[in-house]
Swiss-Prot record:
Name of the protein in its database record: Elongation factor Tu, chloroplastic
Record's subcellular location: Plastid, Chloroplast
Region annotation (G2) ranges: 60-64
Source organism (scientific name): Porphyra purpurea (Red seaweed)
Every tr-type G domain range: 10-214
Major localization class: plastid
Reaction it catalyzes: GTP + H2O = GDP + phosphate + H(+)
Keywords: Chloroplast, Elongation factor, GTP-binding, Hydrolase, Magnesium, Metal-binding, Nucleotide-binding, Plastid, Protein biosynthesis
Superkingdom to which the source organism belongs: Eukaryota
Its biological purpose: GTP hydrolase that promotes the GTP-dependent binding of aminoacyl-tRNA to the A-site of ribosomes during protein biosynthesis.
Region (G5): 174-176
Lineage per the UniProt record: Eukaryota, Rhodophyta, Bangiophyceae, Bangiales, Bangiaceae
GO cellular component: chloroplast; cytosol
């Protein structure tokens, strides 16, 4: 019966390494990859392969990210690592590589640094739900008390940003020494090298402490409307990609955003010119709606399970503003700035009223390349929820990206 073990689908989790530059994020990624490759299910990725992260585009922004996959006995992981600090900021805000949890890397020799703080704040704002901490470069710390001090400081910092600082697992080790040991002996086993064992301990903490995320199909139904047309004798069809959940013929849904919310029943589902009984997250589908005129529904509205999403006009968001080189603005902007907010499938005009710096003070203006917290008000109410991503556009070009951190109204 031993065979079946390899056929089971392990739960999939997306994680990443975050933390201050030069504290060893990429080395740790390589060390995890190499260590877990000794278990035989995934090939090791070398440091250079991870460091030469390819460019990708998300919401009109170019980001360098490396994707590494590996498996523990319990799970399959997709791990994202970014070479530069700006790439992290952009990745976390655009959600280009979604993270269900993250490993915060802190150098045991240096302790938490400014970017450590910034990444914890960002993780909180953009909704990375769970963190595990790796205290790297333990081999450079002779004094046990110093290690305890760094851990204490790390826990306080996490609590400050509303993470459960007392409960988060901290694992100390050396990514470099573990990587060297595995590179020398690729069939190394648990118990043969203390540094490699610490990587196994870290992954045990990740396995147990970072929860398996709810799959998209298990969430409540939502689809943003991309197009609307009428079929003579049958009614109005809204097309789009199902963002989450499952939809069946006969289900009652709400049409939310831009106008009064209204309820309707689904009388048919079509995909690739064929009728279906149900649609799942990820499907591009046409939904036939009972008693709805073509003029009643438009691109930018969403179809959703009743009571699960509501229209709003005011929210706080964490945003990244593109530099001139990235194709963004050449000049700063000030409170009162009125761009378009591209949300799901449509642009809505809004006013940016206020900017707040990380230390809580008001900022007078925002420069290209800045990351800032802002308050915005849209001219039309649309379906908005916490953690939702959007682009900021001006005359059709992207000048920034954001994520809703709080709904105000």
């Amino acid at each position: 019966m031993a065979r079946s073990k390899f056929e089971r689908k392990k739960p999939h989790v997306n994680i990443g390494t975050i933390g201050h530059v030069d504290h060893g994020k990429t080395t740790l990624t390589a060390a995890i990859s190499a260590t877990l490759s000794t278990l035989g299910s995934t090939a090791a990725k070398k440091f250079d392969e991870i460091d030469a992260a390819p460019e990708e585009k998300a919401r009109g922004i170019t980001i360098n990210t490396a994707h590494v996959e590996y498996e523990t006995d319990n799970r399959h992981y997709a791990h994202v690592d970014c070479p530069g600090h700006a790439d992290y900021v952009k990745n976390m805000i655009t959600g280009a590589a979604q993270m269900d949890g993250a490993i915060l890397v802190v150098s045991a020799a240096d302790g938490p640094m400014p970017q450590t703080r910034e990444h914890i704040l960002l993780a909180k704002q953009v909704g990375v739900p769970t963190l595990v901490v790796f205290l790297n470069k333990e081999d450079q710390v002779d004094d046990e008390e110093l290690l305890e001090l760094v851990e204490l400081e790390g826990r306080e910092l996490l609590s400050q940003y509303d993470f459960p600082g007392d409960d988060i697992p901290f694992v100390a080790g050396s990514a470099l020494l573990a990587l060297e040991a595995v590179t020398k002996n690729t069939s190394i086993k648990k118990g043969e090298d203390k540094w490699v064992d610490k990587i196994f301990s870290l992954m045990e903490a990740v396995d147990t402490y970072i929860p398996t995320p709810e799959r998209d199909v298990d969430k409540t139904f939502l689809m943003a409307v991309e197009d609307v047309f009428s079929i003579t004798g049958r009614g109005t069809v809204a097309t789009g990609r199902i963002e989450r959940g499952i939809i069946k013929v006969g289900d009652t849904i709400e049409i939310v955003g831009l106008r009064e919310t209204r309820t309707t029943t689904i009388t048919g589902l079509e995909m690739f010119q064929k009728t279906l009984e149900e649609g799942l997250a990820g499907d591009n589908i046409g939904i036939l709606l009972r008693g709805v005129q073509k003029k009643d529904i438009e691109r930018g509205m969403v179809l959703a399970k009743p009571g699960t999403i509501t229209p709003h006009t005011q929210f706080e968001a964490e945003v990244y503003i593109l530099t001139k080189e990235e194709g963004g603005r050449h000049t700063p902007f000030f409170p009162g700035y009125r761009p378009q907010f591209y949300v799901r499938t449509t642009d809505v005009t809004g006013t940016i009223n206020q900017f707040t710096a990380d230390d809580g003070t008001d900022a007078e203006m925002v420069m290209p390349g800045d990351r800032i917290k802002m308050t915005a008000e849209l001219i039309n109410a649309i379906a908005i929820e916490q953690g939702m991503r959007f682009a900021i556009r001006e005359g059709g070009r992207t000048v920034g990206a954001g994520v809703v951190s709080k709904i105000l109204k």
